[in-house]
Amino acid sequence: MLRSGPASGPSVPTGRAMPSRRVARPPAAPELGALGSPDLSSLSLAVSRSTDELEIIDEYIKENGFGLDGGQPGPGEGLPRLVSRGAASLSTVTLGPVAPPATPPPWGCPLGRLVSPAPGPGPQPHLVITEQPKQRGMRFRYECEGRSAGSILGESSTEASKTLPAIELRDCGGLREVEVTACLVWKDWPHRVHPHSLVGKDCTDGICRVRLRPHVSPRHSFNNLGIQCVRKKEIEAAIERKIQLGIDPYNAGSLKNHQEVDMNVVRICFQASYRDQQGQMRRMDPVLSEPVYDKKSTNTSELRICRINKESGPCTGGEELYLLCDKVQKEDISVVFSRASWEGRADFSQADVHRQIAIVFKTPPYEDLEIVEPVTVNVFLQRLTDGVCSEPLPFTYLPRDHDSYGVDKKRKRGMPDVLGELNSSDPHGIESKRRKKKPAILDHFLPNHGSGPFLPPSALLPDPDFFSGTVSLPGLEPPGGPDLLDDGFAYDPTAPTLFTMLDLLPPAPPHASAVVCSGGAGAVVGETPGPEPLTLDSYQAPGPGDGGTASLVGSNMFPNHYREAAFGGGLLSPGPEAT
């Protein structure tokens, strides 16, 4: 490098030596101001090869401060923009034209927002329970029972219409598919995983998984969903297996002391998961159902009154009643009488609870003991631990009875009219006793004198054309007395008699006949050629030696087989039976 002093004058260096700043500065400033975009591009390529040009650029930057303040370009659009990285890194400086501003898209939002949506103030996708499961009436079943665990019904289920637990996805219109998972957790916080399992349709490993398309059907009902319980020695293994499968919606973990697990009550936890537009898995907040209680446990089962032996009682209380119900705990049950703002509890002890299904108690007194009309109240069972009540039954309180001994009733009856009975025509009641006498034998055949199906008394009298005397038939004697033998009794000759009715009997079969005559006795045995009417040949009045009796052949009044046509030998006189 050559030294140049003030006396050197016109001498000019001839080698490629770095010019001084005083010599190079005046011509450098106007040349750089007149540079255009093509010249700057060529200049950026020669920076690394010429140290003189680097010094010129450095001086220009120091004077104008170009690019050091980070300000935006001025009105001269298209001028080069220099970015300073420090004095030690000037070799890496590049020059180029400023890129034009990007044109906004026609839909009004940057393209990057379609790839990664930022969370906005709008509603987020979430899950709700539209039909809660029925809390009571469901029985948990063991796996060893070898049968279906039943189906959990909806809270609004009745005997006439059945409903099912249901969920709904909301604000999920932009999602293509959502997976809903249901599992069992504790009733209370922190809602750890329960050892019991869900079994039924779409259930594996104790949980239920369904896939939904919100744009098609955002609602879903869980059909044939049952609860399967485990034994106490299997609690720990069941919980560990579920945690290994990732079933822990509240991240509560397991509990070493599993004695705190309530085996008679569970909650169903519903949780939905989906993939966003970037393919990342996202989960919605878990939702818990109402507690579901085991039916077979008396501590949590449904209370029900089957029958009460009385439906009314005095308002003073103390009436003993018998109540039949489902199984209850004798130390955890109460019978309550309630109406509006009044409530009373029945009086009974644990010894009055019979085999958990019957309670003997005494009614409490009503709040107003001076009621004048019956008052109806409700009676129901109530469990003391959780306050659960049964369906009520009506009970009526009756007004107080001021005449407990019935004195007023006896006074209202009055005294008997003794004087009136003594002054009557029958003071001793003889006539009334006669009316109550037992009927005789003939009263069954001749109940009255009127017309009817019975024969009149005159039919039993003998015909005077054939009988010169009185004929007496045993048991058929005409009743004596003024009622039948007086002159006022009218005889009807057209009425059928006993003898004319005998002609209407069917013919007797052929058999031997014996005829006894008054002149002599002769036996004639022969065949009867045909039916002959019954005639009265002869008649011998009963003598003193005879018994005065006549026999009826056959049974009852009319003969089944009568002898020959002779009247005296067949009907009125005793004789041997035909053989």
Curated annotation (Swiss-Prot):
RHD domain mapped to chain residues: 125-440
Region (Leucine-zipper): 40-68
Modified-residue entries (Omega-N-methylarginine), positions: R16
UniProt cross-references to SUPFAM superfamilies, sorted A to Z: E set domains, p53-like transcription factors
Subcellular location: Nucleus; Cytoplasm, Cytoskeleton, Microtubule organizing center, Centrosome
PTM per Swiss-Prot/TrEMBL: Phosphorylation at 'Thr-103' and 'Ser-573' is followed by proteasomal degradation.
Top-rank taxon: Eukaryota
Modified residues (Phosphoserine): S37, S573
Pfam families registered for this protein in UniProt: RelB_leu_zip (PF16180), RelB_transactiv (PF16181), RHD_dimer (PF16179), RHD_DNA_bind (PF00554)
GO cellular component, one term: cytosol
Stretch list, region Disordered: 1-39
GO biological process, alphabetically ordered: antigen processing and presentation; canonical NF-kappaB signal transduction; cellular response to osmotic stress; circadian regulation of gene expression; inflammatory response; innate immune response; lymphocyte differentiation; myeloid dendritic cell differentiation
Keywords attached to this entry: Activator, Biological rhythms, Cytoplasm, Cytoskeleton, Disease variant, DNA-binding, Methylation, Nucleus, Phosphoprotein, Repressor, Transcription, Transcription regulation
GO MF, one annotated term: RNA polymerase II cis-regulatory region sequence-specific DNA binding
Transmembrane segments: none
SMART domains: IPT
Residue window of motif Nuclear localization signal: 433-438
Induction, as annotated: Up-regulated by mitogens and NUPR1.
Domain notes: Both N- and C-terminal domains are required for transcriptional activation.
Disease: Immunodeficiency 53: An autosomal recessive primary immunodeficiency apparent from early infancy and resulting in recurrent infections, severe autoimmune skin disease rheumatoid arthritis, and failure to thrive. Immunologic workup shows increased CD4+/CD8+ ratio, impaired T-cell proliferative response to multiple antigen, T-cell developmental and functional defects, and impaired ability to produce specific immunoglobulins.
PANTHER family assigned: NUCLEAR FACTOR NF-KAPPA-B PROTEIN (PTHR24169), TRANSCRIPTION FACTOR RELB (PTHR24169:SF18)
Function: NF-kappa-B is a pleiotropic transcription factor which is present in almost all cell types and is involved in many biological processed such as inflammation, immunity, differentiation, cell growth, tumorigenesis and apoptosis. NF-kappa-B is a homo- or heterodimeric complex formed by the Rel-like domain-containing proteins RELA/p65, RELB, NFKB1/p105, NFKB1/p50, REL and NFKB2/p52. The dimers bind at kappa-B sites in the DNA of their target genes and the individual dimers have distinct preferences for different kappa-B sites that they can bind with distinguishable affinity and specificity.
Subunit structure: Component of the NF-kappa-B RelB-p50 complex. Component of the NF-kappa-B RelB-p52 complex. Self-associates; the interaction seems to be transient and may prevent degradation allowing for heterodimer formation with p50 or p52. Interacts with NFKB1/p50, NFKB2/p52 and NFKB2/p100. Interacts with NFKBID. Interacts with BMAL1 and the interaction is enhanced in the presence of CLOCK.
Protein name: Transcription factor RelB
Gene encoding the protein: RELB
